[in-house]
């Protein structure tokens, strides 16, 4: 018959004195108190490892910081793990690792790592817009939460205040960006499943609205308005550059001199600055080349064609033309992105081939099969088309287009 160990008492533990050599006091079921020759008293739990069956011991801490009842609770917890073939010490190490990972893998920190990858494939302005939206609306709610603890309802709750203020388009973009962060977390091994896949379905869909724009026959009044507006020469040139090249606001504002091929009369925009992440070449009309000649002395030999007045080593803000349109009284009637719509309408009404127009707008065919077979950029066909557009703008600017039914600029779309 095996000898039964008598459980320890606090009185016995307190009375235990150090000896020349270390010795043990036994509480039973593997729990012992090691009395060191130095006088310290250390709790230990002896057990067999589930896989190797090797005898080992687990430290529970020192007495009296860890009381007798505390040590027994820790022993009970370890025995529960052992009953499931889980090594208590390995479990403890994993918890420490998870705790450390949680501190370095909060939503904010993971989002930052994702954003550093994302910004290499989008324009600087767009990358900044992504970060500002997360910084403003998401990080205050879930930025400090470990990515492993985030559930779908956590994300929905974080976005709900944005819905409450009626910013449904912002809600749509936030859901998309959050989902990209969570997919990044999955792809880097931080989480097994993506909880954000369907969070957009928890919100009302925004009504799609066209960018405020005007018809081509209203170009003369637009040109007159901008010619007489109180704006700087650089801003006026940027407005004309964006109008003549049919580019997006950020693409136009961030144009660099080293992207211009004067011999070929071309502007080669690298993929990194394009919305669709594809190189785009713009044939430059006589009017566009004239804008460049005007900007040479104004840019002062700097990298950017349209340098910022406040920070000359940086480009003008992509919203500069938008602000100028508002100051000219066109707020709500025309936005800078709408300049592309004017050109698109004019070119389509003139009968230019749709594929050539789409190429000029740097649109990507949504039909993947068709896109795979049709890789033409229609560069040569775009040259006369862009010159036709520049001639139309010039005629509108000189007032040589006969106006009809134009009492005031009106909203289109």
Curated annotation (Swiss-Prot):
Residues 209-386 form the Tyr recombinase domain. The active site is at 248, 275, 337, 340, 363, 373 (o-(3'-phospho-dna)-tyrosine intermediate). GO terms for biological process: DNA recombination; provirus excision; symbiont entry into host cell; viral genome integration into host DNA. Residues 105-186 form the Core-binding (CB) domain. Disruption phenotype: Loss of excision of its prophage. Induction: By AlpA. One of its GO terms (molecular function) is DNA binding. The keyword Metal-binding does not apply. The keyword Cytoplasm does not apply. InterPro entries: CB, DNA_brk_join_enz, Integrase-like_cat_sf, Integrase_catalytic, Integrase_DNA-bd_sf, Integrase_DNA_bind_dom, Integrase_recombinase_N, Phage_int_M. Keywords: DNA integration, DNA recombination, DNA-binding, Viral genome integration, Virus entry into host cell. It comes from the Bacteria. NCBIfam families: PRK09692.1 (NF007246). Belongs to the 'phage' integrase family. Integrase is necessary for integration of the phage into the host genome by site-specific recombination. In conjunction with excisionase, integrase is also necessary for excision of the prophage from the host genome. Part of the cryptic P4-like prophage CP4-57, it excises the prophage when overexpressed, which also requires integration host factor (encoded by ihfA and ihfB). This is Prophage integrase IntA.
